[in-house]
């Protein structure tokens, strides 16, 4: 009996070890969990599936379950692998990894960590350590065979050849119903674990995965701190004090989040499809406009016979230049949008497929990759397509017959300005209006996203920058000549180019010495370095330098997830990043910082010159103010408010920021001030109390005054009041000393002594500044603006301090003899301040 029990124990140990070995994943982070999808996740999956385009084709759907190289169905014996781009391939079909020498030499990383692998489908490069096992396909190949094998298996404990209905884990043999009853009656086998026929599976038929360390423990917990699956023993030891969830809760929460992201991307993808069709229609309309103008020109030439033939040919050429330029931009824009559309279709198909799958293990292990792709696709800025501008030929038969040399011109209406051909201007005696203003016309959209595509369009020799005209309004008068091309240089976390193939988006990893090799992916959490170009001529390599030929970029918003961010490549003469101001669209989230130091992003992004209209400021007009500090109107290291989307230097904001804030940062104008309890007692205005201690504003009043002062700095009519003092060293010793916002800020920040001791004293200085500026100007418009500024300031003060009225103190008080702290203008103002 003892020998029989020992044999049974040995058999049970062998069976358990075999089960653990077959079920443990190669990465050591397998998962288990047989939870069914919650209703919310199922609804989100259905919504995502509905939003997925139907015209994707069978080949695109086939890529989800077949190898992208050999086209064979992915089975466990082929070791299916899932790449960061969400394409799958057999392990043997993946090309050999190429070491990234530049990365290893810069950071001292191991060769394995820096090895790069090319995706066989989209040619994207990724680190080999980021490639994971495709858990969705791990059990798919063996499911049918195991089911058929179990159906034909017979009981081995009796000679009746009865079909096996159960399986003893300790004895490792199938049992029929009769033997199961006998098995449970025998003393030495009644405690054995008898399961239904087949290997250990969860309720949904998903194979249980066991811990690599504790071989008999299934992975039943999800550690939120480490973002991985653990067993109970690991959670009590290696993951002690970590936040965790049971698989049921983790699967339910992750499915809801993924379903929400898929729905958002589906809606955005539908908008992109619509815009793509509109661009295609605009291309045809531009072609029709060209033909119509050409006919008008030829008909005019027939009226004045031979003397206008030469000028007529010039006008035809001018019309072709204008329309062909528009058509070329639209063709490139349409081509790029089509590429983005294809990539989004793949992401939608894969995410919907993952959500519809019952394999919860694979969903949790692959959710980081799916999150990353969904977030990046959602952050791509796609502006709506606007109708193209009208273009027609204008002429007067009687007047231009006498002036054949200056006959006619091509008028192309564009958003913000009108552009004519380079021919001579109309003579003064020409009757009739020369052109129509283009305030109601517009140009197609500008695509901004984070992918590079192959240049299979026929215009690869031109600047491959897909960009429309920025919206603005033209003033009175006529703008002649072609639009000025403004070079633009940007630094992004994703630096991509347009290569010569027509494959889906390509990720390049390290900057090279040539135009084609200028490719670097840097993915980091919570930071996005961006830049906007400035018009003008700059030396090569400096911010705003002219772009390299053949390069194009589309911008991408911040992503929230990081997948194996590579160390920064060493900066050399050809890879040194160019940092400029931050540019973000209206959908951006959280603050962003573009900094020349402390960042791992070193990719250089060169943007081809784009045709832009002259900047026109005014309400509702998109100008350069979105790319510069709201206070000093200069670029640099900026942080963006998550609510109002104003950008500030760290020192320009009030109060000054010591460190880069978090993602959900709000500026003082948007931040709700806490209800701070005011200090008891009142403070005198003489600058000191009975004990000789200098009086200061209470913390609550300090924050309120800073908020009001920041509102003045950001208020456009207050721009002339930023710095009125002309002395190199600010001083308020003279009673008639000039006051400006910079001096008031210095005193509020206690850079000048004495500091403000009450809100009334602060209001008196602002009122004194208004009155001084009123004396300096005789312009009626300036006088009216001062009245408006006083009302604006009084409203802000009343909003900040409740029912307290400050109208009485907005008069010039007796001059205060303030001792100068000897601070220079550079010390009193932030690094970007200035007139």
Swiss-Prot record:
Catalytic activity: S-ubiquitinyl-[E2 ubiquitin-conjugating enzyme]-L-cysteine + [acceptor protein]-L-lysine = [E2 ubiquitin-conjugating enzyme]-L-cysteine + N(6)-ubiquitinyl-[acceptor protein]-L-lysine
Span of domain Bromo: 696-800
Single GO MF annotation: promoter-specific chromatin binding
Region named Interaction with MAGEC2: 249-378
Cross-link (Glycyl lysine isopeptide (Lys-Gly) (interchain with G-Cter in SUMO)): 555, 677, 751
Residues annotated with N6-acetyllysine modification: 268, 306, 342, 379, 771, 775, 780
Sequence segments annotated as region (Involved in binding PPP1CA): 368-372
ZnF bounds (B box-type): 150-197, 206-247
Signal peptide interval: none
Biased composition (Polar residues): 436-445
List of residues that carry Phosphothreonine: 499
Region (HP1 box): 477-514
Keywords linked to the UniProt accession: Acetylation, ADP-ribosylation, Bromodomain, Chromatin regulator, Citrullination, Coiled coil, Isopeptide bond, Metal-binding, Nucleus, Phosphoprotein, Repeat, Repressor, Transcription, Transcription regulation, Transferase, Ubl conjugation, Ubl conjugation pathway, Zinc, Zinc-finger
Crosslink feature (Glycyl lysine isopeptide (Lys-Gly) (interchain with G-Cter in SUMO1)) location: 379, 470, 751, 780
Chain positions with Phosphotyrosine modification: 756
Crosslink feature (Glycyl lysine isopeptide (Lys-Gly) (interchain with G-Cter in SUMO2)) location: 36, 129, 201, 256, 263, 274, 306, 321, 368, 379, 409, 436, 470, 508, 555, 576, 751, 771, 775, 780, 805
Alphabetized PROSITE patterns for the sequence: BROMODOMAIN_2, ZF_BBOX, ZF_PHD_1, ZF_PHD_2, ZF_RING_2
EC number: 2.3.2.27
Region Disordered, annotated ranges: 14-57, 413-481
Domain description: The HP1 box is both necessary and sufficient for HP1 binding.
Protein role: Nuclear corepressor for KRAB domain-containing zinc finger proteins (KRAB-ZFPs). Mediates gene silencing by recruiting CHD3, a subunit of the nucleosome remodeling and deacetylation (NuRD) complex, and SETDB1 (which specifically methylates histone H3 at 'Lys-9' (H3K9me)) to the promoter regions of KRAB target genes. Enhances transcriptional repression by coordinating the increase in H3K9me, the decrease in histone H3 'Lys-9 and 'Lys-14' acetylation (H3K9ac and H3K14ac, respectively) and the disposition of HP1 proteins to silence gene expression.
Protein name per Swiss-Prot or TrEMBL: Transcription intermediary factor 1-beta
Species this chain originates from: Rattus norvegicus (Rat)
Source taxonomy: Eukaryota, Metazoa, Chordata, Craniata, Vertebrata
């Amino acid at each position: 009996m003892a020998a029989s029990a020992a044999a049974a124990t040995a058999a049970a140990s062998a069976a358990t070890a075999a089960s653990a070995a077959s079920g443990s994943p190669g990465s050591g982070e397998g998962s288990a969990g047989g939870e069914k999808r919650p209703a919310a996740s199922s609804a989100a999956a259905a919504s995502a599936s509905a939003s997925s385009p139907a015209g994707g084709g069978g080949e695109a759907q086939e890529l989800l379950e077949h190898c992208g190289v050999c086209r064979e169905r992915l089975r466990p014996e082929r070791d299916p692998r899932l790449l960061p781009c969400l394409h799958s391939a057999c392990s043997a079909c993946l090309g050999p990894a190429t070491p990234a020498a530049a990365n290893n030499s810069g950071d001292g990383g191991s060769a394995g960590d820096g090895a790069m692998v090319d995706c066989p489908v989209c040619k994207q490069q990724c680190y080999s350590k980021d490639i994971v096992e495709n858990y969705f396909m791990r059990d798919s190949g063996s499911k049918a065979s195991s089911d058929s094998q179990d159906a034909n298996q017979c009981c081995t404990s009796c000679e009746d050849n009865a079909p096996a209905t159960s399986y003893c884990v300790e004895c490792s043999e199938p049992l029929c119903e009769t033997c199961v009853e006998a098995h449970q009656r025998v003393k030495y086998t009644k405690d054995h674990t008898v399961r239904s026929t087949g290997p250990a599976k969860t309720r949904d038929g998903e194979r249980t995965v066991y811990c690599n360390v504790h071989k008999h423990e299934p992975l039943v917990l999800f550690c939120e701190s480490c973002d991985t699956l653990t067993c109970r023993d690991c959670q009590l030891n290696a993951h002690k004090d970590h936040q965790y969830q049971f698989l049921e809760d983790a699967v339910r929460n992750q499915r809801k989040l993924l379903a929400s992201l898929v729905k958002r991307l589906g809606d955005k993808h539908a908008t992109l499809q619509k815009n793509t069709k509109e661009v295609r229609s605009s291309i045809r309309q531009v072609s029709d406009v060209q033909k119509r103008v050409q006919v008008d020109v030829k008909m005019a030439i027939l009226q004045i016979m031979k003397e206008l033939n030469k000028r007529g040919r010039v006008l035809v050429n001018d019309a072709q230049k204008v329309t062909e330029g528009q058509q070329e931009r639209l063709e490139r824009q349409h081509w790029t949008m089509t590429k983005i559309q294809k990539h989004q279709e793949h992401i939608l198909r894969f995410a919907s497929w993952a959500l519809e799958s019952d394999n919860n293990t694979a969903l949790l292990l692959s959710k980081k990759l799916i999150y990353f792709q969904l977030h990046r696709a959602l952050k791509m800025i796609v502006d709506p397509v606007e109708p193209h501008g009208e273009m027609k030929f204008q002429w007067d038969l009687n007047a231009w017959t006498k002036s054949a040399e200056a006959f006619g011109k091509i008028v192309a209406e564009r958003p913000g300005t009108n552009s004519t051909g380079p021919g001579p201007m109309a003579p003064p005696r020409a009757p009739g209006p020369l052109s129509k203003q283009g305030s109601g016309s517009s140009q197609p959209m500008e695509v901004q996203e984070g992918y590079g595509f192959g240049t299979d369009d026929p215009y690869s020799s031109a600047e491959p920058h897909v960009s429309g005209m920025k919206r603005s309004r033209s003033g009175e008068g006529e703008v002649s000549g072609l639009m000025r091309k403004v070079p633009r240089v940007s630094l992004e976390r994703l630096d991509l180019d347009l290569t010569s193939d027509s494959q889906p988006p390509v990720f390049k990893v390290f900057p090279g010495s040539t135009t084609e090799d200028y490719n670097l992916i840097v993915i980091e959490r919570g930071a996005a370095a961006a830049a906007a170009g400035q018009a003008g001529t700059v030396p090569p390599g400096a911010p705003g330098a002219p772009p390299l030929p053949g390069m194009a970029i589309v911008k991408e918003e911040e992503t929230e997830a990081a997948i194996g961010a590579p160390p920064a490549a060493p900066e050399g003469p050809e890879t040194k990043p160019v940092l400029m101001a931050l540019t973000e669209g209206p959908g951006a989230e959280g603050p962003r910082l573009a900094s020349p130091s402390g960042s791992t992003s070193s990719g250089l992004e060169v943007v081809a010159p784009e045709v832009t209209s002259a900047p026109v400021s005014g309400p509702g007009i998109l100008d350069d103010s979105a790319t510069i500090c709201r206070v000093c109107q200069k670029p640099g290291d900026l942080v963006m408010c998550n609510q109002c989307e104003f950008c500030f230097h760290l020192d320009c904001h009030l109060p000054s920021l010591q460190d880069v804030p978090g993602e959900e940062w709000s500026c003082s104008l948007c931040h709700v001030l806490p209800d701070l309890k005011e200090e008891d007692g009142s403070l005198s205005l003489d600058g000191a109390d009975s004990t000789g201690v200098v009086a200061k504003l209470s913390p609550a009043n300090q924050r309120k005054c800073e908020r009001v002062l920041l509102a003045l700095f950001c208020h456009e009519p207050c721009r002339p009041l930023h710095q009125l003092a002309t002395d190199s060293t600010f001083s308020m010793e003279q009673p008639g000393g000039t006051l400006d916002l910079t001096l008031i800020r210095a005193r509020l920040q206690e850079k000048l002594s004495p500091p403000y001791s009450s809100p009334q004293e602060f209001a008196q200085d602002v009122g004194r500044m208004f009155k001084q500026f009123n004396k300096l100007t005789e312009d009626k418009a300036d006088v009216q603006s001062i009245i408006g500024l006083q009302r604006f300031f009084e409203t802000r003060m009343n909003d900040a301090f409740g029912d307290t009225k400050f109208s009485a103190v907005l008069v010039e008080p007796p001059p205060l003899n303030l001792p100068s702290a000897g601070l220079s203008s550079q010390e009193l103002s932030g690094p970007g301040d200035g007139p």
